[in-house]
């Protein structure tokens, strides 16, 4: 493979030279490991570095400074101290299955815990204490020798800690619940080196967070206490259609039928370019019961499917079904060696040297599992929620997209039925979508890193899929399949309504190191917002507009100047959105250019300081300062103040501050796109029956109820402050003109409506545009489905801006 040559060596050398403390770090880690250190430490200069840093997924961008393979939990805290002394981050790795290689980040110390894989089963076989780094196949193999098992996932090489950190999606979950519901306790090493127990009674918030709230986020889990299960004999299903004509009717019927079946039946449909397949596990069911279920499904009436229905399958059969066997064999005859994985179970990469150390399987009475094949994995994850099912048109489009790729892509959709109706077991956990998900859609491609043209085609395909499907189904995604290119806020997409609680847990577990890490969660969202808008500039940016960035006191502005021939001489101040916690003038760059060109106005876009580091009223004061600077910098007597979402809230706040300062005549009008106008806790009592959108549209838009809660918590504005809850300001009547925009499926829909009513009552000249059925900020979505409505929005906005600008 081409990347194993001189370029790779040069890159590794760069890693070493970029971190002069790497020698000190190596010495520190060596002192922790003792005599076995040379066998358990990998540096960029070692021939095993490529193999060691990759994990399962072949990737090229993540180059850690050093990798340390722990064998005892007592080594973890000293390793964290080594990283802190060297001034770098310590990153835990269990299975190494992160599709984005987030378990092997640049410039970090990787603490690999795959050799923390002990299994101690209680005498009554009801519980087991296990090392958190054990791989699922090894766990099942060890438990099988005790005649018991664990409610876990399919892939044998996935590490337990990462699996449970994501929630524990499994093929028994519709009746038995997610894997995290079968965790009784854990031991966690925190950032300050303390090892604590997390359970329902001890550190319950931490126990909540580590189960579904993101692996490696709150500390390094080194041990789990699991509740074990004797899995009953079950019935297994495989249906296969090898013709393209059956793909749509089979997929449609499956999605209509499978999630609605009894909880004991868990299944998936695999959609390929030219065929489709259904796999199912009837937990505790008989062959006759499963056959009756399938006969009533309508699936057998579609085309000519090959049908396999097997009963009496023991646990080994069930776990191997669809992998090494397509039937249920007599006990003891099934080959379950696929589960007998070693701590480092992956295949070689090209001719590179593999890292091997203490690769001992859990069973010596069967062959060791064949190496798990690595490839350049490309993936997308979408939850379909119960209240927003796929339409036939959307389903057909997805099938057409899969069929459009070449055979080398090995593209497929792995779609699972969810609709979990059984009560949650154990104490609450951080997985956000258990009760809401109807189905999960995963799309996978084998990348082509050695073929730039094909790789570009695949990247564009996934990008287009994201832009098409995300606005349709929403942001909900499975955190086990993290996606750097997700087009929604990743925090709320993966953790839903639990984000703020998880941030609070993060603060506690980081102890004295909390502020930088908590802010990083929000900074990551900010970076994601900028990345999305730079990749999908809607409308296309007009490069003919000249720009200049100017730094003011504690903030900055970007000035957009129209060509002299088209200049109107007017000025508008634009304030970007982003929940007061993310964004910059960059995310509205294309919009500001369009306004400048089409209106002839000079646009001054404000870069204000963001929460949670800078809470209310810091950002507002920055915007006031920038507006006053604009009035003094340009030869105008008045200007328009405009913004979107949180930016619209700030625009109202600035205008009303100027009104109270006796400068109201300086503001021609306010243009407020989907504004936040009142804190939910400050809605007047007589208006509460009109303020229902927060819950009606809780999951129908990017700014979900959970996201809004998090934004409000981070910004920390007093609910009744008249410059935040601008609806309550007593001098609304002194605003000259206002333009408001409402989106019908927005959590902020009623903020706009209540503000409209208040302005009309105050006698303020008003223009109001409503977009029923459209989500928050829909005009910025990179979706052809929304293109016509987006263009209409921009035309209406420009007309309103011209009206506001008139004296």
UniProtKB/Swiss-Prot annotation:
Signal peptide range: 1-18
Cofactors demanded by this protein: FAD
Family annotation (SUPFAM superfamilies): alpha/beta-Hydrolases, FAD-binding/transporter-associated domain-like
Keywords from the UniProt entry: FAD, Flavoprotein, Glycoprotein, Oxidoreductase, Signal
Pfam families with a match to the protein in the record: Abhydrolase_3 (PF07859), FAD_binding_4 (PF01565)
Disruption of the gene: reported phenotype: Abolishes the production of most pyranterreones, but accumulates pyranterreones 9 and 10.
Pathway assigned in UniProt: Secondary metabolite biosynthesis
EC assignment: 1.1.1.-
Protein induction: Expression is positively regulated by the cluster-specific transcription factor pytR.
Annotated glycan sites: 45, 106, 120, 242, 295, 351, 419, 699
GO MF, one annotated term: oxidoreductase activity
InterPro entries: AB_hydrolase_3, AB_hydrolase_fold, FAD-bd_PCMH, FAD-bd_PCMH-like_sf, FAD-bd_PCMH_sub2, FAD-linked_Oxidoreductase, Oxid_FAD_bind_N
Record-stated family: Belongs to the oxygen-dependent FAD-linked oxidoreductase family.
Function of the molecule: FAD-linked oxidoreductase; part of the gene cluster that mediates the biosynthesis of pyranterreones, a family of antioxidative compounds. The first step of pyranonigrins biosynthesis is performed by the hybrid PKS-NRPS synthetase pytA that condenses 4 malonyl-CoA units ato the acetyl starter unit by the modular PKS of pytA. The acyl chain is then connected to an L-serine through the amide bond by the modular NRPS of pytA. A tetramic acid is formed and released from the PKS-NRPS pytA to give pyranterreone 5 with the help of the thioesterase pytI.
Name of the protein this chain belongs to: FAD-linked oxidoreductase pytB
Native source organism of the sequence: Aspergillus terreus (strain NIH 2624 / FGSC A1156)
Organism lineage string: Eukaryota, Fungi, Dikarya, Ascomycota, Pezizomycotina
Annotated gene: pytB
């Amino acid at each position: 493979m081409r990347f194993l040559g001189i370029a790779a060596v040069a890159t590794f050398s760069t890693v070493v030279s970029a971190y002069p403390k790497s020698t000190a770090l190596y010495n520190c880690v060596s002192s922790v490991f003792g005599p076995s250190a040379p066998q358990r430490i990998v540096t960029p200069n070692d021939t095993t570095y490529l193999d060691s840093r990759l994990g399962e997924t072949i990737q090229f961008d993540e180059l850690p400074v050093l990798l340390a393979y722990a064998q005892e939990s007592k080594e973890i805290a000293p390793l964290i101290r080594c990283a802190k002394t060297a001034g770098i981050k310590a990153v835990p790795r269990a299975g190494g299955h992160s599709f984005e290689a987030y378990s092997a980040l640049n410039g970090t110390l990787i603490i690999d815990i795959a050799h923390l894989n002990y299994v101690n089963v209680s005498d009554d076989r009801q519980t087991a204490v296990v090392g958190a780094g054990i791989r699922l196949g090894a766990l099942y193999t060890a438990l099988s020798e005790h005649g018991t098992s664990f409610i876990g996932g399919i892939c044998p090489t996935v590490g337990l800690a990462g699996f449970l950190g994501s929630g524990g999606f499994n093929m028994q979950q519709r009746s038995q619940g997610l894997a995290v519901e079968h965790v009784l306790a854990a031991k966690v090493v925190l950032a300050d080196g303390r090892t604590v127990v997390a359970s329902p009674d001890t550190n319950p918030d931490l126990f909540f967070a580590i189960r579904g709230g993101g692996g490696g986020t709150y500390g390094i889990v080194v041990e789990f206490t699991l509740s074990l299960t004797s899995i009953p004999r079950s019935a297994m299903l495989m249906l296969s259609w090898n013709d393209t004509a059956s793909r749509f009717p089979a997929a449609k019927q499956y999605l209509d039928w499978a999630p609605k079946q009894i909880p004991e039946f868990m299944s998936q449909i695999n959609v390929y370019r030219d065929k489709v397949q259904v796999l199912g596990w009837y937990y505790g069911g008989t062959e006759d019961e499963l056959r009756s279920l399938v006969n009533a499904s309508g699936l057998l009436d579609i085309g000519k499917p090959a049908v396999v229905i097997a009963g009496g399958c023991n646990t080994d059969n069930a776990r191997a079904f669809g992998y090494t066997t397509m039937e249920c064999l007599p006990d003891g005859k099934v080959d379950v060696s696929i589960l007998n994985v070693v701590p480092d179970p992956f295949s070689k990469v090209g001719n590179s040297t593999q890292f091997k150390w203490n690769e001992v399987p859990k069973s010596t009475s069967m062959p060791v599992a064949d190496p798990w094949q690595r490839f350049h994995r490309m993936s997308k994850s979408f939850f379909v929620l119960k209240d927003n099912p796929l339409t036939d048109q959307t389903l057909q489009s997805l099938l057409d997209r899969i069929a459009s790729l070449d055979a080398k892509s090995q593209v497929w959709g792995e779609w699972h039925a969810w609709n979990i109706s059984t009560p949650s077991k154990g104490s609450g956990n951080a997985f956000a979508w258990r009760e809401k998900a109807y189905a999960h859609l995963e799309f996978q491609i084998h990348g082509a890193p050695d073929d730039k043209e094909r790789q570009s085609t695949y990247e564009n395909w996934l990008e287009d899929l994201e832009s098409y499907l995300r606005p349709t189904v929403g942001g909900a995604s499975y955190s086990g399949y993290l996606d750097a290119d997700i087009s929604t806020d990743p925090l709320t997409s993966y953790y839903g309504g639990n984000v703020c609680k998880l941030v609070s847990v993060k603060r506690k577990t980081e102890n004295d190191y909390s502020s930088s890490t908590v802010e990083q969660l929000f900074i990551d969202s900010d970076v994601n917002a900028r990345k999305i808008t730079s990749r999908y500039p809607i409308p296309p940016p007009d490069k003919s507009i000249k720009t200049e960035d100017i730094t003011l006191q504690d903030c900055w502005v970007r000035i957009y100047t129209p060509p002299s021939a088209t200049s109107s001489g007017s000025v508008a101040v634009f304030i970007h959105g982003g929940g007061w916690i993310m964004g910059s003038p960059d995310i509205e760059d294309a919009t500001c250019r369009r306004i400048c060109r089409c209106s002839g106005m000079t646009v001054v876009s404000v870069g204000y300081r963001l929460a949670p580091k800078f809470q209310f009223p810091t950002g507002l004061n920055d915007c006031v300062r920038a507006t006053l600077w604009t009035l003094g910098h340009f030869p105008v007597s008045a200007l328009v103040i405009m913004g979107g979402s949180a930016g619209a809230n700030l625009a109202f706040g600035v205008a009303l501050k100027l009104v109270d300062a006796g400068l109201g005549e300086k503001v021609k009008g306010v243009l407020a796109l989907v504004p936040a106008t009142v804190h939910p806790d400050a809605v007047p009592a007589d208006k509460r029956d009109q303020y229902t959108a927060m819950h009606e549209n809780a999951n129908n838009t990017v700014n979900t109820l959970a996201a809004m809660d998090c934004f409000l918590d981070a910004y920390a504005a007093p609910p009744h402050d008249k410059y935040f809850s601008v609806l309550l300001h007593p001098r609304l009547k002194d605003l000259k003109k206002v333009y408001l925009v409402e989106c019908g499926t927005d959590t902020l829909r009623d903020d706009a409506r209540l503000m409209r009513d208040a302005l009309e009552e105050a006698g303020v000249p008003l223009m109001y545009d409503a977009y029923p059925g459209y989500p928050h900020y829909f005009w910025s979505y990179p979706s052809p489905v929304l293109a016509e409505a987006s263009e209409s929005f921009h035309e209406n906005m420009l007309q309103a801006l011209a009206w506001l600008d008139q004296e």
